[in-house]
Each structure stands twice: as C-alpha cells, then as structure tokens.
C-alpha cells in the first residue's frame, strides 16, 4: 500500500467517525437540493517526492492530465476564460461555475495571477535569492471577490522553499486549501500542485523535494457515503505511481506542456466510481 493510499483510507475513516455535519451549506446538487457534507478540520499530510512518494491513490482512477492542464491555464495562460480552457485544453468541468454569460469564472485563479504578475515575481525572487522565505503564491484577493461573482479559490496559497542536500538544491512546496472534497478532488488538487512544483524546479534545474498539504475543511458530501465505504473495502494496487516531467533541466516554465508529464507505474483499481458533484 502506498503512503497516499494509507492517508486516503485514514482520512475517510476519520471523517466518517469523527466528522460533523455542515450547516447552512452553500453548494447545491444539480436537482437544487442543498449539498451538505460531513467534515473534519485541520488535515495535514507530507510526501517526500524525492523518495518516490506521490499524493495519488490507487484505489480509483484519477484524471491527472486534465488537472495538469488546469494548472497551465491558471499559471501559464493566467486566464479565467472558459473558452481558453475548453478550446486549448479540452477541459470542461469548470463550465458549471461560469459567472452569468461572461464566459469566465469571474476574477478568480488565473485572473488574479495575471493581475498581480504572481508567477513572474515568484520566479524572479527564486532566481535572485532562492533562500528567501517569501516565495508565496496567494490567490486570496478580497478586491477581486467584491468586483465579480465566482467560486472563491479552494487551493488558494502555495509556499516554496529550497534546501541544499549533498550539493543538490531541492524545492519544497506547501499547498494550503480552505476546502476539499476528499473522495473526488483530493488527489487531483494535490497532484496538480506537485506538477506546478516540478515545473518550477525544472525551470531552475533543481530537484523536487517535499510536498506538504494542509486542508482546513476536509469533507465527504452526504451523497457519497456509499462510495466512501466502497473505497475502504478496496484493496490497493501494488503499483508505485510517480509523476515524471520529461524536459531538460533549465526548461523555461512557460514552455512546459501537459504532454511533457508522464504518470509512470499507475494501475488503479477499477471500476471507476460515480459521483454527483456539488456546485
């Protein structure tokens, strides 16, 4: 059993046994009913990517390529346009969060990255002094929230640090998330930010180090309890999945493509589970 599978099962059990039910929930299912959830607060996990520990479960298939494409949309294109996401990347799951008829998700995610020139500033800081302790991506922009409607960012802060070990520089990353759907989005969010970490490391020719993941509200929706029990019953695959970025060291951050990533030794348990998502 991989570390990710162990953490996955432990988190499911913790939510089912110790969790409390949400009140006055915002999300709704497609039929209009309120999407309540059972949740715990303060969930933390740690993976040493340099030792082959990756935050992806083998208990069900996880769509990695579309998750990586979303990261490129946010941090390379720096866009909130659904047309860009649909046409350039063939990713459509954000369409349910379109704001009115704007063709966008509001001033969120990529729009905030562009507004504050976040990626260029981050890369410049890391180039000038990798050991500075201010390498932070923050998507939490109150002014943007007041200017337009739109889903507030779930994965909203990423911090980066470097370590020199035996002459090699390792890039560590910490992802902070306000809210996370444990069964559906947990490993998607984790792996897409591992991909971002790998892109930045490649830009500088560094090694990937540790990935730290903190979630404030970790939940299972009230229509997912059957799937949760099924996941607990499943025996994990014997594979040891890892994400590989097949570009030379020093490749410019903005030149990396989704096709450059390869998920190696991934043979998840099937069949895939079905989930009715909360919007």
Swiss-Prot record:
SUPFAM superfamilies: Thymidylate synthase/dCMP hydroxymethylase (SSF55831). InterPro entries: Thymidate_synth/dCMP_Mease (IPR045097), Thymidate_synth/dCMP_Mease_dom (IPR023451), Thymidate_synth/dCMP_Mease_sf (IPR036926), Thymidylate_synthase (IPR000398), Thymidylate_synthase_AS (IPR020940). It comes from the Bacteria. It catalyses: dUMP + (6R)-5,10-methylene-5,6,7,8-tetrahydrofolate = 7,8-dihydrofolate + dTMP. It is an enzyme of class 2 (transferase). GO terms for cellular component: cytosol. It is found in: Cytoplasm. (6R)-5,10-methylene-5,6,7,8-tetrahydrofolate binds at residues 181, 278. Pfam families: Thymidylat_synt. GO terms for molecular function: thymidylate synthase activity. Its EC number is 2.1.1.45. The active site is at 154 (nucleophile). Signal peptide: none annotated. Pathway: Pyrimidine metabolism; dTTP biosynthesis. DUMP binds at residues 133-134, 178-181, 189, 219-221. Keywords: Cytoplasm, Methyltransferase, Nucleotide biosynthesis, Transferase. Homodimer. Catalyzes the reductive methylation of 2'-deoxyuridine-5'-monophosphate (dUMP) to 2'-deoxythymidine-5'-monophosphate (dTMP) while utilizing 5,10-methylenetetrahydrofolate (mTHF) as the methyl donor and reductant in the reaction, yielding dihydrofolate (DHF) as a by-product. This enzymatic reaction provides an intracellular de novo source of dTMP, an essential precursor for DNA biosynthesis. Belongs to the thymidylate synthase family. Bacterial-type ThyA subfamily. This is Thymidylate synthase. The lineage of its organism: Bacteria, Bacillati, Bacillota, Bacilli, Lactobacillales.
């Amino acid at each position: 059993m991989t570390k990710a599978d162990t953490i996955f099962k432990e988190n499911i059990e913790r939510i089912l046994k110790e969790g409390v039910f949400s009140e006055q929930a915002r999300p709704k299912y497609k039929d209009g009913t309120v999407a309540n959830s059972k949740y715990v607060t303060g969930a933390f996990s740690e993976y040493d990517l340099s030792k082959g520990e990756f935050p992806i479960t083998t208990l069900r298939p996880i769509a990695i390529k579309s998750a990586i494409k979303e990261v490129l949309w946010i941090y390379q294109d720096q866009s909130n346009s659904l047309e860009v996401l649909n046409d350039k990347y063939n990713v459509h799951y954000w369409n349910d969060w379109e704001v009115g008829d704007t063709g966008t998700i509001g001033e969120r995610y990529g729009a905030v990255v562009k507004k504050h020139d976040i990626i260029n500033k981050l890369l410049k800081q890391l180039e000038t002094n990798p050991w500075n302790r201010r390498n932070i991506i923050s998507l939490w922009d109150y002014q943007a929230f007041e200017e337009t409607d739109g889903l507030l960012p779930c994965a909203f802060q990423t911090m980066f640090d470097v370590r020199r070990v035996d002459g090699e520089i390792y890039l560590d990353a910490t992802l902070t998330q306000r809210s996370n759907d444990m069964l559906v989005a947990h490993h998607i969010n984790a792996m897409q930010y591992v991909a971002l970490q790998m892109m930045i490391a490649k830009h500088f020719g560094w090694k990937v180090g540790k990935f730290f993941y903190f979630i404030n509200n970790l939940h299972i929706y009230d229509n997912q309890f059957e799937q949760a029990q099924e996941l607990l019953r499943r025996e994990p695959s014997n594979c040891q999945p890892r994400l590989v970025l097949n570009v030379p060291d020093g490749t410019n951050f903005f030149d990396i493509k989704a096709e450059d990533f390869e998920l190696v030794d991934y043979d998840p348990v099937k069949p895939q589970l079905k989930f009715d998502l909360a919007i």
